[in-house]
Amino acid sequence: MSQTPSSLRDLEHHSAFVERHIGPNDAEIAQMLDVVGHACLDALTDAIVPGNIKSPAPLALPEAITEEEALAKIRAIADKNTVFRNFIGQGYYGTHTPKVILRNILENPAWYTAYTPYQAEISQGRMEALINFQTLCADLTGMQIANASLLDEATAAAEAMTLAKRSAKSRSNTFFVHDAVHPQTLELLRTRAEPLDIVLRVGTPEEALQAECFGVLLQYPDSFGHIGDHAALADAVHAQGGLVAVATDLLALTLIAAPGEWGADIVVGNSQRFGVPFGFGGPHAAFMACRDAYKRSMPGRLIGVSIDAAGNPAYRLTLQTREQHIRREKATSNICTAQVLLAVMASMYAVYHGPDGLTRIARRTHRLAAILAAALRSAGVTVGERFFDTLHVKAIDANAIHARARAAGINLRAIDSEAVGISLDETSTRADVVALAALFGAQADVDALDAATADALPQGLLRTTPFLTHPVFNTHHSEHELLRYMRSLADKDLAMDRTMIPLGSCTMKLNATAEMIPVTWPEFGAIHPLAPAEQSAGYAQLIDELEAMLVECTGYDAVSLQPNSGAQGEYAGLLAIRAYHRSRGEAHRDICLIPESAHGTNPASAQMCGMTVVVTKCDANGNVDVDDIRAKAEKYSDRLAALMITYPSTHGVFEEDVVAICEAVHAHGGQVYTDGANMNALVGVAKPGKWGSDVSHLNLHKTFCIPHGGGGPGVGPCAVKSHLAPYLPKTLGGEGDVGMVSAASYGSASILPISWMYVTMMGSAGLRKATQVALLNANYIAKRLAPHYKTLYTGRNGLVAHECILDVRPLEKTSGIGAEDIAKRLIDFGFHAPTLSFPVAGTLMVEPTESESQHELDRFIDAMIQIREEIRAIEDGRLDREDNPLKHAPHTATQVSASEWTHAYPRELAAFPLPSLKQQKYWPPVARVDNVYGDKNVMCACIPVDAYKEDVEA
C-alpha cells in the first residue's frame, strides 16, 4: 500500500507541545463530545458561551512553536541579562542553593505541583516541612509562634502594622517607622496605610521615644547595617499601650540577640538568603512571628499539630477562621497564595546546615565584612561601627566608586552622592574583599587583617540563647540523609505527579517541564532587583512581551506584573479604581458591591482599600441577581465605587447578563472589577476588557501554568483599561499616583518565564483549544455523573463552564454522608478532593482542566460512582449508617493491616474499593485529622520526638 509523501511543513509539527499539554487526543475528544452531545469543540463552545461576549477574531499571537524552539528563544532573552557580583543588599543577598535542594525540591513536581494543604491527610509531608519553617522563624526571632510564609518582607511589614492596629491598647492612629527600614518596606507601608487612614511618622528610634503611637516598626540590623539597642524604646512603646514590630534578618539572628528577648511583639523578615536566589526580586518566602497573645489576629497560614482518628500526631491548617475564605471582609488579611515552595526550600536549608552550620555561615560572612571594614579604615575611609554583614561607607565620591565597581563587574548599593552600601553574604570570598577594598584605594591582606581585627557585633547584643534544638535540625546533614528525608516527606503527599487535582476555582493544570527549565538559569536567578537597568535588559524584554501577551488575551490596555498573588492583584485593581475616582474629585465613592458567591479575597481586598462592602444576592439558578445589582447600584449611586464579579461565575456558569451588569454599574458612576480566577474558561474565546469590564487580576499560577507550589508562589497581574492605566502600582523609585503593592518592582519576576513559555509554545490556536477542552472536560464529568449526582447549577443549554458543582446535600439527608466524608473517601481512591463547600456549603466543586486525559477523567468518575454505590448501600441498610468506609475514611496501611479489625465492613472495601487500586495505591500517612482538637490545642512548632515514640510503643 503506497503512502502519499508528506511535505516538510507537515513533518515539522510546530504544534507538538499543544498535544502534550492538552490531555485528551483528538479521538478521545470526539468520544467525549459524543457523550455531551455536540459535534465539535466550536459547537460546544457556541452552546456554552453567550454570543454577545465571544471574541470575533482569533488571538493576535504567533503560531505555536516547539519546546526546543521556545527554549532557544528564551535563552536568547536570558543572555541579554548581565550577571555582576552583587553587594547591594537592601533585603536581598547572595546565597548558595544546595544542589540536593535544587534538584529535589525546586525541580521536583512532587513538591511544586501540590496545592495548598486544605486536605490535611494528603499534605502531611509538606506541612512537616512548613512546621520546620515555622519553628526556624520562631526560634531565631525569640517569638512563640510563626506563620507558614508571607509574600515578601515589605508586605509582611505592612501586615505587622495592621496587626498592631488591631491588637494594641493604644487608641492612637499613628504608626512610627524607623527611618532606616528598607526603602521598599516604607513604600509598602505608605500604600497600605493611606486607605486605612493610618498616619505614618518616619524618624529615628530616639524620636520614637517621644512619639504617641499604636506601634513602631524597627529594622534590626537596619538597612545600612547598624545594629541598634532598642530595649528602652520597646519599654516606652509598651508603656503607652503600643506594640513593637521588628523587621530582621534570620542569618544575623544566629549571632545577635533575638528581638523577642528585648521586647518585640511582632517580627517579620525574608528567608531568601536561606538558599533562594535573587530572582530579580522574587519569589521569596517572608515570615511573621509574634507573641502567642496575637496568634488569632495573625495573617497568613498556620500549620498546627492535632491528632488523627487513631490518636496519632497529625498536621493541619489551624485557626482558619482568621482567613479570608471564611471571614471575608472581616478577615485579618486578604492573603491566600503565599510562598510555600520557597518556605520549604528555606526550611530544608536550615535542616541541612543545622544550627552549627548556619552559625558558621553567619560568622564567616561577618568576618569578611569586619576584615573589609578594617581595610577601608586603614585607607582613611569612614565605615559604620556596629554591623553584621553590611557596611555604610561615607564621605566618598559615590559616583566615582560606582563607576570603578561597574568596570570591575561589581554592584554596590547606591545611597547618595557621598555614601554607598556594601553587603557581604554566603557567596562572598576573600578575593571579593580584596577587590572591594581596591575600589576605595585600599589594600587587603586578608589573613593579617583577620588576625588583627575584632568582630563588629555589639557585645551587649550577642545571642546567648540556643536555637533549632529539635532533632530535625540536627540529623540530616549528609546529602544522603537529607535526600531521604525529603523523599520521605514527598511520599506522604498527593501532588499532580501522581493524580488529577480536581479543585474547582483552582485550575490545577499541567506545569510542563520545558516551562520550568528557565527558572533555574543563573541569567534569571542571579539578577539583583536593584541592579542597574542595563544589566536586566533580558528581564525588560521578557516583561514587555508577557505584558503584551496578557493584554491580547484579556482585551485590556495595560498590565502590571508587580502583584505576587491573586489577592495582591485584586488589591492593586481596587487601588486603581479608588485613585481614579479621587482624580475626578469623587473620593466619596466607597461602596463595593460583591455577590454573595464571591471568593473570600474579594471582600477582604475591598476592606483593605477602605471600601465598604455591600453584598448582592444570587438567584435560584446560581447567577448573580441582576435586579439586585441594579437596585443597589441605584441606591448607592452617589457612593458606588465598584462591582466585583467573577466570570464565569464561581457557580461554574457563563451568566447571560454580564454586559448588562457592566452597563448598569457604569450608569451609576462605578467601575467593574472582574476577578480573573476563572480566566481558564475565556482565553481565546472571550475578553473581559471588551465586554465592559474595567479591570481584572489574572492568576498566572492558574491559567498561565505557574505551579501552585503547595500554596505559592504565584503571580497576580493587574490588567486595566486605558483610563485606569495611570493608577497601576509604581515601581521602586518611580513616579505614580498609586504606591507599590509588592516589595520588588516586578514582583516574582523569576517565575515569569513559565507563563511566557506556555503562551509561546501554545500559540493562538493552541490557547483557544485549551480553553475549549477545559469546557469539554468539565461537561463530560457533569454528564457522566448526572445519573448519580446532581449538578447544582447549569447555564445555557444545560451546560456548565470549566467547572461544575456536585450537590451532595440530598445524600446527607438520606445517608448521613456529607461532602467532607466523600472528600476523605476519595483519598482511598488516590484522589485529591474537589473544592469542599465553596461556593455553596455541602457541595463539591470540580474543575478538571484541559490537561487531564479521558483515562484520568474516567478514573475519577469511576471513583465517584463507586462512592455513590457505597452511599446507596447505607441508604439500603447494607452498610451501617455510622460504621462505614466513608465515615472512617481515609484508611491507612497501618489500620487495614492491623491484627484486629473492628469495623462492620471488610478490610478490602476499605483499602481497595476498586480492583485497579491493587496495581497502584496511595496510602495516606494519617487517618482523618481531628480539626476541633487542633483548634483547641494550638501547637505550631515541631512535634517532640517522644510523641512519635509513644505512637510506636502504642
Curated annotation (Swiss-Prot):
Signal sequence coordinates = none
- Under Enzyme Commission nomenclature, its number is 1.4.4.2
Q: Per its UniProt record, what CDD domains does this chain match?
A: GDC-P
The cofactor(s) it depends on are: pyridoxal 5'-phosphate
User: What GO molecular function annotations does the UniProt record carry, in alphabetical order?
Assistant: glycine binding; glycine dehydrogenase (decarboxylating) activity; pyridoxal phosphate binding
| Subunit (UniProt) | The glycine cleavage system is composed of four proteins: P, T, L and H.
Q: Name the family the entry cites.
A: Belongs to the GcvP family.
Name listed for the protein in its UniProt record? Glycine dehydrogenase (decarboxylating)
